[in-house]
Swiss-Prot record:
Motif ('KMSKS' region): 270-274
InterPro entries recorded: Cys-tRNA-ligase, Cys-tRNA-synt_Ia_DALR, Cys-tRNA/MSH_ligase, CysS_C, Rossmann-like_a/b/a_fold, tRNA-synt_1_cat_dom, tRNAsynth_Ia_anticodon-bd
Record protein name field: Cysteine--tRNA ligase
GO molecular function: ATP binding; cysteine-tRNA ligase activity; zinc ion binding
Primary subcellular site in the record, as a coarse category: cytoplasm
Name of the coding gene: cysS
Keyword Nucleotide-binding: yes
Length: 464
C-alpha cells in the first residue's frame, strides 16, 4: 500500500484513491521567465518518481503539470530584453523541456498553459462572483477570504494573523487585506507587450492563483487525488487554490492529498539573485556534469527534507553512480525479463522514501560483488538495473557512461590497475583492462618512459 504525507492532515496516510482505476495528479509547474534552477528541478524530479510509482501500482495515471506563461516576472523579462511575453515564454518553455529531458524526467500527461485557458479562468471567476465569494473593485476582481470560513486549513494561518505585505499582496481596492486578485486591469506595459485579454471586467489578465484552479478543473475535474508542489507554494498559492476551488464547487473536496517537497539551499543559504548563488540546471550541464548525476543528487535526500546543494553533493553523486556503473562493465543488460526489487518498491511506497530505496541499491551492489556464480550475478545485476532505472538512473551503458569525458578518474583508475597488473606480470588481467578501456571508447599507448597516453573523445592525456 502506498503511503504519503498529507500536508492537509499533517500526517502520513495510506493512499486511498478516489478511483483506483484512474489516478489524477496536478503539480504546479514552472513560471517560464528564465532557465530552470535546481530548486525548480527538485520538484519536477520528485513528482516524476511519484508519477512512475503510481503508474506501477495503479496503471492509469493522469498527470497534469501546468506552465505559467503570463506573470509579472515574464513581463519584466520581456521588458528587460525588449521582447514580448510570447517570445519569452516560448523560449524558456523550450529550455525547460530540454533541461528536464536531460535529467530523465518523463513528460506529464498534459501540460496546459495559462494563456491557453483564459476562457476557463474567466468562467471560474464568474462562478465565484455569482456565489458571492468574489467582488469587483476599480476594474479588479478579488476573492474575499472572509467569505470562506475554512481559509487557512492547509497552512494553519488564521486570517487575522496573516503578515500582509510579505507573501500577501496588499491593495487599496480590497475589502480585507487578505483578499487576493483574480483579475487585474491592463496597464500601459500590458498593452505594450500584448499581455492582456478581453473580459467582462475590461481588458486585463488573470491573477496567479486562479490559473491553477481553472486548469486543474479543466483537465481533472473538481475532485482529484494529489496536488503537488514545493513547500514554498503552500502559502499563499495552494491555500488560495483551495479557497477558490472549494468556493466555486460547494460539494468539492478539491485535492484529497497535498504533497510538498522541501526547500533547497545553496551552501546553507537561500538561492537568490542578490546573493549571486542561483544554480541553473543548464549551467551544470554545460560544465560537463551529467544529467543523471544532477538527478541523483536531487533524489538522495528525502523529498520532504531540506536539501543543501554543495560541491560535495555533486562529487558524491558522481562517485556513487560510477560505482553502480562499474557493476555493468562485463554485462550486456537486457532487464525486460526481470522485476524491480520488491524491497525497493516497498521503500518507495513508504512516503516516497528514495534514500531507503537507494540504500537497497547499495545492498544489491554489495551482493553482486560478492557473488561468484556468473548466472546468479547476471540475475542480480538485471534486478539491480531494473530497480535503478525505476527512479531514472543507470539509463546508459557502461561504455557510454565512462566514455563521455567526465570520468577521467575512472579511466585513470583502470590504467593504474593495469600498470600494477603488468608489474606483477599478470598479463591476462592487463589485457582484459586494455579491452575494457577499448569498449569504453578509450585507446591506450604505452610509452618507453613508462607513462601511458590515452585517447578518447577528449584530447589525449599523458598519464604518469
Amino acid at each position: 500500500m502506498v503511503k504519503l504525507y498529507n500536508t492537509l492532515t499533517k500526517k502520513k496516510e495510506p493512499f486511498t484513491p478516489i478511483d483506483k482505476d484512474h489516478i489524477k495528479m496536478y503539480v504546479c509547474g514552472p513560471t517560464v521567465y528564465d532557465t530552470a534552477h535546481i530548486g525548480n528541478a527538485r520538484s519536477i524530479v520528485v513528482y516524476d518518481v511519484l508519477f512512475r510509482l503510481l503508474k506501477f501500482c495503479y496503471g492509469k495515471v493522469t498527470y497534469v503539470r501546468n506552465i505559467t506563461d503570463i506573470d509579472d516576472k515574464i513581463i519584466n523579462a520581456a521588458n528587460e530584453k525588449n521582447s514580448n511575453i510570447e517570445s519569452i515564454s516560448k523560449y524558456y518553455t523550450k529550455t525547460f523541456h530540454e533541461d528536464m529531458e536531460s535529467i530523465n524526467c518523463a513528460e506529464p500527461t498534459y501540460e496546459p498553459k495559462a494563456t491557453e485557458n483564459i476562457d476557463n479562468i474567466i468562467k471560474l471567476i464568474e462562478s465565484l462572483l455569482q456565489a458571492g465569494h468574489a467582488y469587483e473593485s476599480n476594474k479588479h476582481v478579488y476573492f474575499s477570504v472572509e467569505s470562506y470560513p475554512e481559509y487557512g486549513v492547509l497552512s494553519g494561518k488564521k486570517i487575522d494573523e496573516l503578515n500582509y505585505g510579505s507573501r500577501v499582496e496588499v491593495g487599496e481596492n480590497k475589502k480585507h487585506p487578505g483578499d487576493f486578485v483574480l483579475w487585474k486591469p491592463a496597464n500601459e506595459t500590458d498593452y505594450k507587450l500584448s499581455s492582456h485579454w478581453n473580459s467582462p471586467w475590461g481588458e486585463g489578465r488573470p491573477g496567479w492563483h486562479i490559473e491553477c484552479s481553472a486548469m486543474s478543473y479543466a483537465y481533472l475535474g473538481k475532485d482529484f487525488d494529489i496536488h503537488g508542489g514545493g513547500i514554498d507554494l503552500q502559502f499563499p498559492h495552494h491555500e488560495n487554490e483551495i479557497a477558490q476551488s472549494k468556493s466555486a464547487f460547494a460539494e468539492s473536496t478539491f485535492a484529497k492529498y497535498w504533497v510538498h517537497n522541501g526547500f533547497l539551499t545553496v551552501n546553507e543559504e537561500k538561492m537568490s539573485k542578490s546573493l549571486f548563488n542561483i544554480v541553473k540546471v543548464r549551467d551544470l550541464l554545460d560544465s560537463g556534469i551529467k544529467g543523471e548525476v544532477i538527478r541523483y543528487a536531487l533524489l538522495k535526500t528525502h523529498y520532504r527534507k531540506p536539501l543543501d546543494w554543495t560541491e560535495n553533493v555533486i562529487s558524491e553523486s558522481q562517485e556513487t553512480l560510477n560505482k553502480f556503473y562499474r557493476l555493468l562493465r562485463s554485462t550486456c543488460i537486457e532487464e525486460s525479463d526481470t522485476e524491480v526489487s520488491k524491497d525497493f518498491i516497498e521503500a518507495l511506497k513508504n512516503d516516497l522514501n528514495i534514500p531507503e530505496a537507494v540504500a537497497i541499491l547499495h545492498e544489491m551492489a554489495t551482493e553482486i560483488n560478492k557473488t561468484s556464480n556468473e548466472y546468479e550475478k547476471l540475475k542480480l545485476t538485471k534486478k539491480f538495473v531494473k530497480s535503478a532505472r525505476f527512479i531514472g538512473i543507470l539509463e546508459s551503458s557502461y561504455q557510454e557512461w565512462f566514455a563521455s569525458g567526465v570520468s577521467h578518474q575512472e579511466i585513470e583508475r583502470l590504467i593504474d590497475l593495469r600498470k600494477v597488473a603488468k608489474q606483477n606480470k599478470d598479463y591476462d588481467t592487463a589485457d582484459k583492462i586494455r579491452e575494457q578501456l577499448k569498449q569504453m571508447g578509450v585507446t591506450i599507448s604505452d610509452n618507453e618512459d613508462g607513462t601511458t597516453t590515452w585517447y578518447g573523445k577528449l584530447s589525449p592525456i599523458v598519464y604518469r
